[in-house]
């Protein structure tokens, strides 16, 4: 017998003839008889009866062609010997279906009918509920070929024994080619109906798709079902089919192929041991859906389609979705929605930790990598995904500091990557790519970079909507659309050191966890509250339950007597009477307030809706500040306005809360106002970051703010300013006495005031968008202190006009223009000029100082009273309009604190006494003990204030 080569597409696969089956003689004769027409129609060859007899009796002789024939003719591959009995049965059914419809060729819709007829699953074709009768009706309705009852009966009574000579169309032959390719991809040594089904759904010319659409079936779901059935069958033994599952697959008669011995199994174990099959996980639904990124995925597919150097490397910051792109590609392959050349591929994710773990001996890691590369090259259908690929660079014996005979892992990958033998998708960050890959030009040119940028807020919302179902199922909750929008908006605005969509996903994840825990806590508290109530509080509920119980009992009694109500109506009464109980599995609603609460805890920035208590705090903020800072109403109003704008949400989101410059004489309350704001609104004075600019008088001290440059001490520690803001972004930053700093310090403030961020010595961008920036300056105070002949060009009179606020403000602003650069002054939101303190205001300041002194005496158990003449004396001696309140503080120390300390040392006071400061007959202050009913005891701390 001579076997001639043919122009069929399957000749590309080196066809051979089908060997005899090792199954029963009946099935063998069926396969042999049907294969004659199958081979003749598909390949254009003829098999005589003698040949068929040789098929079933002497399979080994048929393979041994004479050497002369081998040299002259192209051999035909072992495609048909790999068809299982079920596959042959499906092909015969398809021929019968085509003949019953009056066709002279088998098209893809007939092949679909054959596959459906062969599938004996009670749930229909691939578990979809599609039966052969429904499929025939769909085909007849589409092509208007409704047959008579006799033809239908003939089609339904097809048998294996009847042979046909029905040829196959070109599109059907392509389906067989795709089935062969997918079988090779899965390392299966047979072709089952599921392989043919996957090939049909992959390269369908549209005919089978029309039938499935008419039946209401989803082609992607059917493909996934076929893949699941195939992979479930072969999962027990690596890539070998299971011999025990006769109901689904039969082992091909030819047995295992050459090369599937221990050696092949060992290489196979290397791939399975160190890699995770992302395609299989996607088929099982274990990978989250991937939304968007169409351009990046298209670019990756283009690179994978190249002949050489077909290795994309995904570059992007942590959290932008590099790994998700590889997972999305695996999902598209599993759902058969990827391009055709990728459908035969598997994406295997390399676990670098497993690869390196346990490599104790020298060269053991290199041996693992070499075996892994060999297995991937041998398979030819594996795309290796290496996440954080920079961890492999520098590993190996060379990277460990050893000398000689060691290899870097990158050097092992280079040859295979360059020739296209090893196809790889890598991912790393931009910094690691710059530091690791760009140093090795030979390695970098083998990868094609694909830049993965942070998605926009709109795209991030779409991503969260796609993931919402997964997180709702995990937390047993429901996310509102407002919660999704809030997660993206709040994370983008207030979490500066992370990237979308990762930080938004983390927000909804933690918000779901928080809502679930809060619901459990509330349920527990309600249960405890119910148990603690007296019966009178819920007597009405008890009466309602008793009434319902009586109705149910009467209904059951009537049913027993056979009087009125049937079982169905009785059930209706019982079910309708009882109130619906709130189940434990009822989903919890997660709204924007839950998202805001998590964002506030995470970032330290109050982003929740303004509560009633906080609203009252903001409304009374000015009064609280005036109670501590006297005589500076303009400054108090200015700083209060800035805080209110920020909290309401009207401030510019790309700039700090405010950048203010406090100018005025010394000792008038510039620093004290900042401390008061930090204590009243930000929690405490410790929440204020104060930088005394007298420490930055030299040029090189600018490094103290943002961090030392490389090579200097403290490079790894970061800057005092930037590190403090990174840890507490919602704070007050005080640059005290800014004019004392070196002029180069002002240059670094320009970007801070305008753009709201600084870049530290580590290259990290630090956001100041939630910080209140305040600078204090004494520019102009020297002239005021000198009195009449000031240094800023004006003369002060003895009367109050010389110290007027308007004149002082104009002169100080003019002096600021001469001292600071215009670009700095132009970026300051508001310049606040502090007034000089009047004599009447000194009494209020004195009362505040005495209250502070009383608070300190509480720890000693002694009260304090100061007579009015002593207060007037203190104000008279401590008042100096040029120096503000600081002389007053020194006078209090001299007149009150020093005599008190002497009296304590002399033992004049015991706990419970009250120190009374009065003037003696000579007009000098003296301290006396006042043990009467008004004495303040040690435990009575509240009366001090």
Curated annotation (Swiss-Prot):
It is found in: Plastid, Chloroplast stroma. Optimum temperature is 45 degrees Celsius. It comes from the Eukaryota. Disruption phenotype: No visible phenotype. One of its GO terms (cellular component) is chloroplast. Its cofactor is Mg(2+). Residues 590-781 are annotated as: II. GO terms for biological process: protein-containing complex assembly. Induction: By dehydration and salt stresses. Induced after one hour of dehydration-stress and reaches maximal levels after 10 hours. Induced by cold, ozone, senescence and dark-induced etiolation. Down-regulated by ozone (at protein level). Not induced by heat stress. Its main location: plastid. It is an enzyme of class 3 (hydrolase). Signal peptide: none annotated. Residues 168-233 are annotated as: Repeat 2. CLPD is consistently found in two distinct forms, the full-length protein and a lower molecular weight form porcessed at the C-terminus. The processed form might be the active form and not the full-length protein. Belongs to the ClpA/ClpB family. ClpD subfamily. This is Chaperone protein ClpD, chloroplastic. The gene is CLPD.
């Amino acid at each position: 017998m001579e076997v001639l080569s043919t122009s069929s597409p399957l000749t590309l696969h080196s066809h051979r003839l089908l060997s005899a089956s090792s199954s029963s003689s009946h099935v063998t004769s069926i396969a042999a008889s049907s294969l004659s027409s199958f081979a003749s129609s598909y390949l254009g060859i003829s098999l005589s009866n003698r040949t068929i007899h040789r098929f079933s009796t002497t399979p080994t002789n048929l393979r041994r062609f004479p050497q002369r024939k081998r040299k002259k003719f192209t051999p035909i591959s072992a495609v048909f010997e790999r068809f299982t009995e079920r596959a042959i049965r499906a092909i015969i059914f398809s021929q019968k279906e085509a003949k019953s419809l009056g066709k002279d060729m088998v098209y893809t819709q007939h092949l679909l009918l054959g596959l459906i007829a062969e599938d004996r699953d009670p749930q229909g074709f691939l578990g979809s509920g599609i039966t052969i009768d429904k499929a025939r009706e769909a085909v007849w309705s589409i092509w208007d070929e409704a047959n008579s009852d006799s033809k239908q009966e003939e089609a339904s009574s097809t048998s294996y024994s009847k042979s046909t000579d029905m040829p196959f169309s070109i599109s059907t032959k392509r389906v067989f080619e795709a089935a062969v390719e997918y079988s090779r991809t899965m390392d299966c040594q047979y072709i089952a109906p599921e392989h043919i089904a996957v090939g049909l759904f992959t390269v369908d010319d549209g005919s089978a798709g029309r039938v499935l659409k008419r039946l209401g079936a989803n082609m992607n779901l059917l493909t996934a079902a076929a893949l699941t059935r195939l992979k479930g069958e072969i999962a027990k033994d690596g890539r070998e089919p299971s011999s025990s599952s006769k109901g689904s697959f039969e082992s091909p008669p030819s047995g295992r192929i050459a090369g599937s011995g221990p050696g092949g199994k060992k290489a196979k174990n290397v791939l399975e041991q160190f890699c995770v099959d992302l395609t299989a996980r996607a088929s099982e639904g274990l990978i989250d859906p991937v939304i968007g990124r169409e351009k990046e995925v298209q670019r990756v597919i283009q690179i994978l389609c190249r002949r050489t150097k077909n290795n994309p490397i995904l570059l992007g910051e942590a959290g932008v979705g590099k790994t998700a792109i590889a997972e999305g590609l695996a999902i598209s392959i599993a759902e058969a929605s990827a391009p055709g050349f990728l459908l035969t591929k598997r994406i295997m994710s390399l676990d670098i930790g497993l690869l390196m773990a346990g490599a104790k001996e020298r060269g053991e890691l290199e041996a693992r990598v070499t075996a892994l590369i060999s297995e991937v090259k041998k398979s030819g259908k594996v795309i290796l995904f290496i996440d954080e690929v920079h961890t492999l660079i520098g590993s190996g014996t060379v990277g460990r500091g050893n000398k000689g005979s060691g290899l870097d892992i990158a050097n092992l990958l280079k040859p295979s990557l360059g020739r296209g033998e090893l196809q790889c998708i890598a991912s790393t960050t931009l910094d690691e790519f710059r530091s690791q890959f760009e140093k090795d030009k030979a390695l970098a040119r083998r990868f094609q970079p694909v830049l993965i940028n942070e998605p926009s807020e709109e795209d991030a919302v779409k991503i969260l909507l796609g993931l919402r179902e997964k997180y709702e199922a995990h937390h047993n909750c429901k996310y509102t659309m407002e919660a999704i929008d809030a997660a993206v908006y709040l994370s983008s605005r207030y979490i500066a050191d992370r990237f979308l969509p990762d930080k938004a996903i983390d927000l909804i994840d933690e918000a779901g966890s928080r809502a679930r825990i809060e619901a459990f806590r509330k349920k527990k508290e309600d249960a405890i509250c119910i148990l603690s109530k007296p019966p009178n509080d819920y007597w009405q509920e008890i009466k309602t339950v008793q009434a319902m119980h009586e109705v149910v009992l009467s209904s059951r009694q009537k049913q027993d007597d056979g009087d009125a109500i049937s079982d169905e109506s009785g059930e209706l009464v019982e079910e309708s009477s009882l109130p619906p109980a709130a189940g434990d599995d009822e989903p919890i609603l997660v709204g924007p307030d839950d998202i805001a609460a998590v964002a506030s805890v995470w970032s330290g920035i109050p982003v929740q809706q303004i509560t009633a208590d906080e609203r009252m705090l903001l409304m009374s903020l000015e009064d609280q500040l005036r109670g501590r800072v006297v005589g500076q109403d303009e400054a108090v109003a200015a700083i209060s306005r800035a805080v209110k704008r920020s909290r309401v949400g009207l401030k510019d989101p790309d700039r700090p809360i405010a950048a203010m410059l406090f100018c005025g004489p010394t000792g008038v309350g510039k620093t004290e106002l900042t401390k008061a704001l930090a204590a009243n609104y930000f929690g405490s004075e410790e929440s204020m970051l104060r930088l005394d600019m007298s420490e930055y008088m030299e040029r090189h001290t600018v490094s103290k703010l943002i961090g030392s440059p490389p090579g200097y001490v403290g490079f790894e520690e970061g800057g005092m300013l930037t590190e403090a803001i990174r840890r507490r972004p919602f704070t007050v930053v005080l640059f005290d006495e800014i004019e004392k700093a070196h002029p180069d310090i002002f240059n670094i403030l320009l970007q801070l005031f305008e753009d709201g961020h600084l870049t530290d010595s580590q290259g990290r961008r630090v956001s100041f968008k939630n910080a209140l920036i305040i600078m204090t300056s004494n520019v102009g105070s020297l002239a005021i202190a000198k009195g009449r002949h000031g240094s800023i060009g004006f003369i002060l009179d003895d009367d109050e006009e010389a110290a007027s606020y308007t004149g002082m403000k104009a002169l100080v602003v003019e002096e600021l223009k001469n001292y600071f650069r215009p670009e700095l002054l132009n970026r300051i939101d508001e310049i606040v000029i502090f007034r000089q303190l009047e004599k009447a205001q000194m009494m209020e300041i004195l009362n505040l100082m005495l209250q502070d002194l009383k608070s300190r005496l509480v720890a000693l158990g002694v009260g304090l009273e100061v007579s009015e003449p002593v207060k007037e004396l203190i104000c008279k001696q401590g008042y100096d309009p040029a120096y503000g309140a600081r002389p007053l503080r020194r006078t209090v120390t001299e007149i009150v604190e020093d005599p008190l300390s002497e009296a304590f040392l002399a033992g004049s006071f015991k706990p419970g006494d009250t120190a009374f400061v009065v003037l003696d007959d000579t007009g000098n202050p003296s301290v006396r003990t006042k043990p009467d009913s008004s004495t303040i005891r040690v435990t009575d701390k509240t009366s001090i204030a």
